[in-house]
UniProtKB/Swiss-Prot annotation:
This is Plastocyanin. The keyword Transport applies. It is found in: Cellular thylakoid membrane. Keywords: Copper, Electron transport, Membrane, Metal-binding, Thylakoid, Transport. Participates in electron transfer between P700 and the cytochrome b6-f complex in photosystem I. It comes from the Bacteria. One of its GO terms (cellular component) is plasma membrane-derived thylakoid membrane. Belongs to the plastocyanin family.
């Protein structure tokens, strides 16, 4: 889930 960290920081935010 490293890509989610740069976008929002939460895996749930990745949609």
């Amino acid at each position: 889930e490293t890509f989610t960290v740069k976008m929002g920081g939460d895996a749930g935010t990745l949609q």
